[in-house]
Amino acid sequence: MDQQSTRTDITVNVDGFWMLQALLDIRHVAPELRCRPYVSTDSNDWLNEHPGMAVMREQGIVVNDAVNEQVAARMKVLAAPDLEVVALLSRGKLLYGVIDDENQPPGSRDIPDNEFRVVLARRGQHWVSAVRVGNDITVDDVTVSDSASIAALVMDGLESIHHADPAAINAVNVPMEEMLEATKSWQESGFNVFSGGDLRRMGISAATVAALGQALSDPAAEVAVYARQYRDDAKGPSASVLSLKDGSGGRIALYQQARTAGSGEAWLAICPATPQLVQVGVKTVLDTLPYGEWKTHSRV
C-alpha cells in the first residue's frame, strides 16, 4: 500500500497554522505552541488571496474553501480541550522558551533552536497531538489509554534527542522546600560535588549528589512534563511537574509527590529514570490535576 495514502498527520508552519485558525474561527491554542492568536473579522475573503491557501489545497488540507474534515476535527480538540498534557524537550539545557537574542523582533513566535514541544490534547475521547519543531507544527490523532502510554511517548521523544541509561542511584524522597534552598546555594558553587553537604544531610547519597550535579550543571537533554484541565472558562494546572535530566551520570527523574491528606509538607522524589519510575512520575502529574479524573473529566 502506498505509505503516503496511509498517513494522517499534517505539517504546516506557524503562518499556515494561523490560517487554519482563521478558517475555523479558533482564537488560540495551547500557549506552548507559540501560535499567533486569531481575531475574527467580518469577512474571510482575504484568505482566498493568501498564497498559503494554494499550498494547503495542494496538500489536501483545504478542500475548496473548507478545511479537511479530519484536520478540522483535530483543530477543534486543540481549540477547546478538556485536558492538555505538555512535554517540553530540549537538547542541552531547557530554556523554557527564553531566547537570549537581542536581535529577536518584538512579538516573535520563535522557540529556542534546541527545543521541541509536544501538546497532547483530549476532548471527549478524541486525543490529538501537536508537535512544534522550529517553525513547523505537526498535528495528528494519537492513541492514549493510560499514564503508561503517555510516559512511552515522552521517553520516545527524549530518545530521539539523546540516549542515556537510568542513573545508577537509589530513589529518595526529600522535603521540597529544603531541597530548593539547598539547591540554590549549591548552584552558586557551580554544583561542586564537595559543596553538596546540605543535600547529604537530607539523606541523599554521595552517588546521587554527583549524578544530580552533573545533570543540573550540564544536561545533555531535558524534558519537563505537566498538565492542565479546563472547566468552563477556568483552567487549572497539575500541582506536580515531572523533570527528566540526562547527565554524564545517567538519566534522572524528579517530581513533586502528591500531597497526602492532612500533610502540609511537599516532597520531591529523586530517582533513576527507569520506564517504570517515569510512568509513576507521569501518573503523579495527572493525579495532581484539580478537577478530577483525567481520563473522563469534561470542561462543561
Curated annotation (Swiss-Prot):
This is ESX-5 secretion-associated protein EspG5. The lineage of its organism: Bacteria, Bacillati, Actinomycetota, Actinomycetes, Mycobacteriales. One of its GO terms (cellular component) is peptidoglycan-based cell wall. It comes from the Bacteria. The keyword Transmembrane does not apply. Its main location: cytoplasm. Keywords: Chaperone, Cytoplasm. InterPro entries: EspG (IPR025734). Specific chaperone for cognate PE/PPE proteins. Plays an important role in preventing aggregation of PE/PPE dimers. The keyword Repeat does not apply. It holds the Pfam family ESX-1_EspG. It comes from Mycobacterium tuberculosis (strain ATCC 25618 / H37Rv).
